[in-house]
Amino acid sequence: MKQNSFIYLRGLKHAAFTVFCVENCQKFYYDPQFNVRVPFSSGQQVKRSVLEKLNDILGVQPSPTEFYFDVDKKGALKEGEVLSSCDPHYVDQLLGGWMRTPKGGKEKAVKRRSPLSISAMTPLHPLLSGLPKENISFDRSDRPNAHKVVVRDANGNVLTDEQVCNFLDGNDRSLYRKWIPDNNRATGLFVYDVAIDQRRLFCVSTNQFEPEITADMVESLKADGWTVVNTAFGECLSMPKEQREQLIPAIADALLDWQITSNQARTFSLMETLAVAVSDNANTLAAAIRAKLIDDNESKPKARPIIDENAGAKTFIALPCANYIVTETESADALVRARQELIDRMMAFDYENQL
């Protein structure tokens, strides 16, 4: 029987009073079954966080991106294309995929689908997350002499200090304090899913009718030791084994130990990984880390998180998981073992002889 080409991963994370995606302070969607708003992090943000972690682990720069803008006849700046380098020498390009479609149609479009299919990070169950609001203030009223206040009238003219004082008579306002109400925050138990297509993980197609890379890049990769292999997708170039073996441990680390930090200057959460399930059968992941509705004869439904070690997937339960889920098998080395499981599976795949 042919080896399974996919590795499926489900991770369970805890987030506390933080911000994922900024849209009205925190992106959310409405769950129609339980009539609640639930926060989420988009798959794009999860993917970017994983790739940023990967670059940090390897100590390499991200791939360069070209941003194009057009100035129209009226002198206004218009949005143009955003073009990737389409260079698999960059690990974030190789694993993240790319698309390059220059304006004008004179250059052939080049595109590669990522070998990592990554879900949005959503609540384990709609009833196991929250979207609380926080009212905050930007307050500098303790040292008013150190700061400057500028008040403008309806025409944009700056008022004098005397005019400002006259205006404030009868107005209970502080000019050194900004009130910022209704800031949504995310909290609760969240899951993300990853499917790793090992057939394309370290391979790029050489087909020039629907190209992933240019003909020049094909020659460049061959010169760097990439070898021609035949896969289910046709002729491809495979990364040298020694380079793969350097990347695989970093990929495993990044998939387990990423955090969202882009919006968290003052709402940082550890986003600790509580549990991990790994399998070559996607169905077993949903059973291994799940929630169950509880009927306790109360007006509001409740949900209980469950880690099931007998659902067909290999599960790894970290110590912090016991804060939120009743379990007897949590261990200090759970994530180390999960990392090794991912490494072993990726190392075992025969990238040169896929057919």
Q: Each predicted region: which residue ranges?
A:
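RNA-binding basic/glycine-rich loop and surface signature characteristic of RAMP-family CRISPR effectors
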Residues: M1-L355
